[in-house]
C-alpha cells in the first residue's frame, strides 16, 4: 500500500497492481473501485473521515471486491454504477447511464460510457479548471484495457471520446501498468524519443516507490500508441499485438 496525493485524491496501492482512489473533501470521501476493504477502512479511521459514495467503473472482482464490506461499515453510502450492471453489481443503489450528471462533494460529475473492456464500463468525469477522469480499466498510461466483452470498434470509439476531453484532464486509472506498457511500445517504436523519455521518468518514480499515475491527457496522447492510432485498423493491430506480448 502507498499514498499518492494530488488534488485531494489519494491512491492506495493494493493486491499486485491495483490502485484504489480516495477523493477527499471536508472529511467526506468518495472511493473509486475498491478492490479490497481493509486499507480503505484503515485510512478512513486513521484520518477521522467517512465515506460519502463509492464509484464503480465496472463489475470485475478486483474493482468491487471491497464494496460489500464498506457498505456493512457505512450502510448509507451511495454506490454508483452503470444501470447495465444491476445484476453484476447488485449492491448499487444509484444506477446511471451515459451522459447523466451527478453532484458529489459539491462537484458535477458526468457519466461517460466507455465500452470495450466490458459491455457496461463507465467513467466519471469531473469538469473544471483542473478536470479529472476516473477511467477504471479503459485507459492506462501507455496502454488500454483488454477487450473482454466488447469489440475493437467499441474500445476505439471509447478512446476517441477520451481524446475529445480537455487536454489538461488528469486521468486516474485503476492499475499500475505503466512500465510494462512502455516497454511494449518501445518494442514497436524503438526510436520514439517521447516514449523513451517517459520510460526514464517512470523508472525513476518506481525506484523510489512512487505511483506513475495519474497522468495528463495531453502528455499521454504523445506516448500512448493506442491514442495515437489513426483508425480502427491500426488500433486493432496494436491491441492484438499487445495481447501477445509477454
Curated annotation (Swiss-Prot):
The keyword Hydrolase applies. Pathway: Secondary metabolite metabolism; methylglyoxal degradation; (R)-lactate from methylglyoxal: step 2/2. InterPro entries: Clx_II_MBL, Glyoxalase_II_hydrolase, HAGH_C, Hydroxyacylglutathione_Hdrlase, Metallo-B-lactamas, RibonucZ/Hydroxyglut_hydro. Zn(2+) 1 binds at residues 58, 60, 117, 137. Keywords: Hydrolase, Metal-binding, Zinc. It catalyses: an S-(2-hydroxyacyl)glutathione + H2O = a 2-hydroxy carboxylate + glutathione + H(+). Binds 2 Zn(2+) ions per subunit. Zn(2+) 2 binds at residues 62-63, 137, 175. Its cofactor is Zn(2+). One of its GO terms (biological process) is methylglyoxal catabolic process to D-lactate via S-lactoyl-glutathione. Its EC number is 3.1.2.6. Belongs to the metallo-beta-lactamase superfamily. Glyoxalase II family. PANTHER family: HYDROXYACYLGLUTATHIONE HYDROLASE, HYDROXYACYLGLUTATHIONE HYDROLASE GLOB. Monomer. This is Hydroxyacylglutathione hydrolase. It comes from Prochlorococcus marinus (strain MIT 9312). The gene is gloB.
Amino acid at each position: 500500500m502507498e499514498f499518492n496525493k494530488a488534488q485531494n485524491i489519494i491512491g492506495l496501492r493494493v493486491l499486485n497492481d491495483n490502485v484504489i482512489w480516495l477523493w477527499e473533501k471536508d472529511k467526506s470521501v468518495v472511493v473509486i473501485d475498491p478492490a479490497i476493504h481493509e486499507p480503505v477502512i484503515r485510512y478512513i479511521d486513521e484520518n477521522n473521515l467517512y465515506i460519502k459514495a463509492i464509484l464503480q467503473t465496472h463489475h470485475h472482482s478486483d474493482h468491487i471486491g471491497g464494496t460489500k464490506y464498506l457498505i456493512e461499515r457505512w450502510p448509507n453510502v451511495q454506490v454508483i454504477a452503470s444501470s447495465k450492471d444491476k445484476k453484476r453489481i447488485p449492491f448499487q443503489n444509484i444506477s446511471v447511464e451515459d451522459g447523466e450528471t451527478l453532484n458529489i462533494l459539491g462537484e458535477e460529475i458526468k457519466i461517460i460510457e466507455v465500452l470495450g473492456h466490458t459491455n457496461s464500463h463507465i467513467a466519471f468525469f469531473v469538469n473544471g479548471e483542473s478536470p479529472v477522469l476516473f477511467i477504471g480499466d479503459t485507459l492506462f498510461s501507455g496502454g488500454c484495457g483488454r477487450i473482454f466483452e466488447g469489440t475493437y470498434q467499441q474500445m476505439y470509439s471509447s478512446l476517441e471520446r477520451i481524446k475529445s476531453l480537455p487536454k489538461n484532464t488528469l486521468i486516474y486509472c485503476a492499475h499500475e501498468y505503466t512500465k510494462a506498457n512502455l516497454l511494449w511500445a518501445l518494442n514497436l517504436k524503438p526510436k520514439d524519443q517521447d516514449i523513451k523519455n517517459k520510460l526514464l521518468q517512470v523508472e525513476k518514480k518506481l525506484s523510489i516507490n512512487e505511483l506513475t499515475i495519474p497522468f495528463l491527457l495531453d502528455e499521454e496522447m504523445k506516448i500512448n500508441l493506442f491514442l495515437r492510432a489513426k483508425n480502427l485498423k491500426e488500433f486493432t493491430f496494436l491491441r492484438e499485438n499487445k495481447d501477445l506480448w509477454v
